[in-house]
Amino acid sequence: EILNKLDVALDIHSVPTEIHQTIGIADLKHLDFSRDVLKTDILLVDENFDRAGSVVSFVNRNGGIGLGVECGSHADDFASQNALQSILRLLVKMDMLDLNLDEQDKKTEIFRFFEEIFPETLNFHYLRSYQNFSELQPWEIFAQDWEKIYKNQTLAPKYLGIIMDKVILWDGMGFLFEKLS
């Protein structure tokens, strides 16, 4: 019930493993707002939050602005600072705090969700080791599940991201993204 009343939600996460990039998620229609608040290395955007069950998705579906940010590793002080800075930027952006943060502009790569990758069996595997947001050329084959092959079936490069290393049936193994900038 509380989520239905939110104008803005900032969902902050850290991860147990080492991470080299900060990642934000937002609705494409709030792109400028998101860039100002999150200042991440990578910003993932989508226009369709109908299916996802996250706080970010729920708030976006219900007319608010839902933002998510992966700040870094649990054990890294950088993650705590990044979370704090995201909160401060949000409060400044909403005119709830008068503070000069004196930050440098950050180059943010922006990717739009294109397609989720679903395994059919536990035999699903990537054909090589990929880094998050590896570029896939048109028609490039990147995974296999018994006889089924997974490839970039478009005429433009796509980017493989949020890569999972353990197969869980009915759950995604990653996403293909379009690079917007």
Predicted regions mapped to residue ranges:
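Structured catalytic-domain cores with a bias toward divalent-metal coordination
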Residues: E1-S181
